[in-house]
């Protein structure tokens, strides 16, 4: 098949981890895998996540020498440097009359947001790249993650931190082949079946929604509500699926704590922040609710 799957069996659960099947088999890479897992455990990753990242490492290691002979290339930055569980607020850009996207991003970053997704559905490629260059610089200055919505090619050209893929966009396995294992790849989900598919496709996080009606999307999937989130998160726990999950879609401020109580690890916001006159202050207020563990300041 197209996927190579490893399994972790513990007294409490069985976890499956899949990556795109490489040209060559994994025979002889056991020492590499065990060393990688041990390294991720040392960094504080839970065992299932350490195994998943170790599998990523081995997959990149195998691909570092296409002949499968002699020395393999040194593997550097084979996984995103930021633990996404510790960045539970994501801002998704949208058009706002009188306030440019770079101005929006500057405001939310000043308020403490450390994850921005550039979403410009109505813009052409040239405008997205031009805006993306400015947004990337703002994110770098504030130590924030910079992801591009939908377009893998643009994410590659901008050297973004990653890409978020909708259900009808490129397969995450193909995006991983193009972007590499050091980039963040997120995927949209509306059902538990979607989550299983994305998990098998080795996304780094899931955008789960919509929570309720939202004006930022023209084609809306079925609304989940708190009950929908609870059912999906319960199923994830039962099946041993460990991924950061961000709720998205029409979230209001008084929805945040009930949503987090379902087991969702974060939220993605657009209108709630964008429509506030003081975006920086509103961002700070939301972050205080989320009790975010702040990222270290950017180097240099």
Predicted features and spans:
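Glycine-rich beta-strand-to-loop/alpha-helix junction loops that act as flexible
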Residues: 29-30, 208, 245-251, 267-273
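Flexible, gly/pro- and Lys/Arg-enriched active-site loops
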Residues: 19, 167-173, 213-236
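Phosphate-handling active-site elements
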Residues: 15, 40-54
């Amino acid at each position: 098949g197209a996927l190579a799957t490893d399994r972790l069996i513990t007294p409490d659960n069985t976890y499956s981890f899949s990556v795109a099947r490489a040209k060559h088999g994994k025979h002889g890479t056991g020492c590499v895998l065990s060393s990688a897992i041990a390294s991720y455990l040392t960094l504080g990753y839970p065992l299932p996540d350490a195994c998943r990242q170790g599998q990523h490492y081995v997959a990149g290691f195998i691909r570092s020498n296409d002949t499968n002979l002699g020395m393999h290339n040194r593997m550097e930055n084979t996984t995103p440097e930021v633990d996404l569980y510790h960045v539970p607020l994501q801002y998704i850009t949208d058009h706002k009359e009188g306030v440019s996207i770079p101005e929006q991003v500057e405001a939310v970053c000043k308020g403490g947001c450390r994850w921005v997704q550039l979403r410009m559905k109505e813009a052409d490629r040239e405008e997205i790249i031009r805006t993306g260059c400015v947004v990337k610089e703002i994110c770098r200055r504030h130590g924030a993650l910079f992801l591009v919505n939908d377009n893998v090619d643009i994410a590659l050209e901008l050297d973004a931190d990653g890409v978020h893929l909708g259900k009808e966009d490129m397969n995450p396995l193909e995006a991983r082949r193009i972007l590499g294992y050091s980039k963040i790849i997120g995927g949209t989900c509306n059902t538990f079946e979607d989550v299983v598919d994305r998990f098998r496709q080795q996304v780094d996080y899931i955008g789960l929604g919509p929570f309720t009606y939202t004006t930022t999307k023209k084609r809306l999937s079925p609304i989940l509500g708190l009950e929908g989130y609870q059912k999906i998160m319960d199923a994830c726990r039962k099946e041993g699926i460990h991924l950061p999950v961000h709720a998205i879609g029409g979230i209001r401020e008084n929805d945040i704590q009930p949503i987090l109580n379902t087991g969702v690890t974060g939220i993605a916001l657009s209108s709630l922040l964008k429509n506030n006159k003081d975006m920086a202050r509103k961002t700070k207020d939301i972050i205080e609710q989320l009790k975010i563990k702040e990222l270290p300041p950017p180097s240099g």
